[in-house]
Amino acid sequence: RSTARFRDLVEENPRGIWSAPGRVNIIGEHTDYNGGFALPIAIDRHTVVAVGMRHDGLVRVGSTLSDDVVTTELARCVPGAVSGWVAYPLGVLWALGGARGGAPGLDIVIDTDVPIGAGLSSSAAIECTVAVAANDLWELDLDRMQLATVGQRAENDMVGAPTGMMDQIASLFGVEDSAVFIDCQIPEASTVPFALAS
C-alpha cells in the first residue's frame, strides 16, 4: 500500500521500502528510563515506509491512513515547529541532523498495521522505520543502538513524550521467535529464544 500511495503522491517509484515491527513487553515496564532491565518481543504487525530522495531541501510526508500530506523545509524540522503525528517522522530527521543542512530532502509515505494507541509502540515503529531509511539514504552508517537513540530523541524532544528507548530497541533488534533482553543502563541488547507458538 505504501508503494502505491507513494506513486500517487510523487509520480515515480520510491528509492526503497523499509519496515519495523511494533512490540509487546513481557517484563520491565517503565524500567527503561530508570536504568533497569526489560524483555520485550517484536510482534507481527509492522510499519512500512516508502521513501524517495528530493533535491530541493523539502521533506514531504504522507500516509495510507489519511489524504493529508505535510510538506516543510528540512531545516524547519526542529522542536517546537512541528506538531501532530508528523512530529514522529520529522523528529527523527531532526535527530539525525537533517535540520543542520547538507542532507537531501525526502518524500516519505507511511503505512502501518500496528494498532495506534494500543500500547504496541506504533510511534516507535514509525520512528525506527524512518530512521533506518534515512540512515541508508543519507549514508550515515549508524548502528541499531544509535538509531534507537535517534528515535528516543525524536519522541522526547520533538513530540514531548518523556520515554526511554525500550520500544525503539525492541523494534530494531526484534527477530522472530526471540525476545530482546535489554540492559537499559548501558544500554545493551541481545536476543534470547522465546517461541510463543511452542
Predicted segments with their positions:
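ATP-dependent small-molecule kinase catalytic core of the GHMP/sugar-kinase superfamily
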Residues: 140-198
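Short Pro/Gly-enriched beta-strand edge/turn motifs at strand-loop
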Residues: 29-34, 153
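Short Gly/Ser/Thr- and Asp/Glu-enriched loop/turn motifs at secondary-structure junctions
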Residues: 19-21
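Short Gly/aromatic-enriched secondary-structure transition segments
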Residues: 35-42
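Short, surface-exposed beta-strand-loop junctions and turns on beta-sheet-rich folds
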Residues: 33, 67-69, 188
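Conserved hydrophobic/aromatic beta-strand scaffold that supports enzyme active sites
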Residues: 40, 48-50, 179-181
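Anion-binding (especially nucleotide phosphate/pyrophosphate-binding) glycine-rich loop
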Residues: 1-17, 45-152
